[in-house]
Amino acid sequence: MNKLILSAALLLAAPLALAQGIEGKWRTIDDESGKPKAVVQISQSGNTFNGRIVSLAEGVKNECPACQPAKPLIGLNVLTGLQEKDGKYEGGKIYDPKSGKTYSAKAELANGGKSLKVRGFMGVSVLGRTQTWQ
């Protein structure tokens, strides 16, 4: 009887594990230095996902280098408008505070949902770069 209950519980929990999305806190990793930079909180608003910086790694100044007038990085919206389609997130924009440029964005869960591959690009996806957030 206990085995039957355990089996049923595992069977019912399986779809929940597969339904994991991108909502939550993600640690950004600088693709040039390999070091953590910030934590981005991704949340859903309607049918889109947006991300804002909620904390910074030690030693990272809380100022947006490209923002005019100057703004703090914490609270800055850096990811907007992603929409989920077949387990992938597309159609969004990502802001690079270092350059002040906004790029098209897409994202996809990787490594069993433990990391998020975020790609910023201009025009077509091959003209861009990918960061892996943890």
Q: In which residue ranges do the predicted regions lie?
A:
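Bacterial N-terminal signal peptides that target proteins for export
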Residues: M1-A8
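N-terminal signal peptide c-region/cleavage motif recognized by signal peptidases
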Residues: A13-P15
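N-terminal helix-cap/turn-to-beta initiation motif at the start of protein domains
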Residues: A17-K25
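Short coil-to-beta-strand transition motifs
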Residues: Q20-G21, G34, S99, V126-L127
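Central antiparallel beta-sheet cores of small beta-barrel/beta-sandwich binding domains
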Residues: T28-A105
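Low-complexity, intrinsically disordered Gly/Pro/Thr-rich segments
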Residues: G112-M122
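Edge beta-strand at a domain terminus
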Residues: F121-Q134
